């Protein structure tokens, strides 16, 4: 694939990053165990109990560019923040396309996002950093997250959501680090042609849903098919998402039945599937409960002051 091509299908690098950290970082393994224990404890007591109302998360967008086109505009950045605020508050108009049988599952994530107004030193900022790099493209090896390797250093992850926007190779649209990983690499990386709704954003990933998907991972959501190939044995640890054989690509039609999940089939319109941007438009109540538990247990300092 040429460096500047937009992938034809969604590819997410979060699980390879997760598996690498499980192999190499015992601190991450312990943190993941604590995170999942907190999730199951919250289910046992009937739901998360920490935060009430809406959490506002400060965001810093690190634009790491090699060509002028990759140095995306402020307008493109703002368009992505707008998408996130609609998607995580269930105010996106296309949520009305949810099939009637799944409509009762749709939930408000109770999270909103704003570009940071102060930097780590307390100085005023527009929440966007720009770094010219000699690297033609990046991968899921986290080099984009460090000045020393051609990227941009993160702001403190206990206060900010770090979003890196760059050229990704290998067909990647983006990747995230689940809660519990190293602070130096915490955050989300998105291909610039899959970021926002204008500028370099290109179909079929020009509705800003790649960032919605990856921030879902950053908030501890899994892919809805459970990442087990096509075995129908995987689990996303959320009870109200139907079991699915594997990822759905493109623009599926309802119902798409797999894993004996008829008559209604897969929840392919969920943000944590692999459908095109215009075919995903909802989180479920169970996913929101998991997100809120992750804020309580994994990210207790973010969005609270």
Task: Give short role names for the model-derived ranges.
Residues 38-85:
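Fold-level signature of zinc-dependent metallopeptidase catalytic domains
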Residues 61-65, 194, 276:
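Short, histidine-centered active-site or binding-site loop motifs used for metal coordination
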Residues 1-54, 88-89:
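N-terminal zymogen propeptides
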Residues 71-79, 202-206, 210, 266, ...:
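Soluble non-cytosolic domains of exported or imported proteins
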Residues 58-62, 162-164, 189, 271:
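Soluble periplasmic/extracytoplasmic beta-strand elements of cell-envelope proteins
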Residues 49-54, 180-183, 263-264:
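Short glycine/proline-enriched loop/turn "hinge" motifs that connect secondary-structure elements
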Residues 78-250, 255:
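Metzincin-family zinc-dependent endopeptidase catalytic domain
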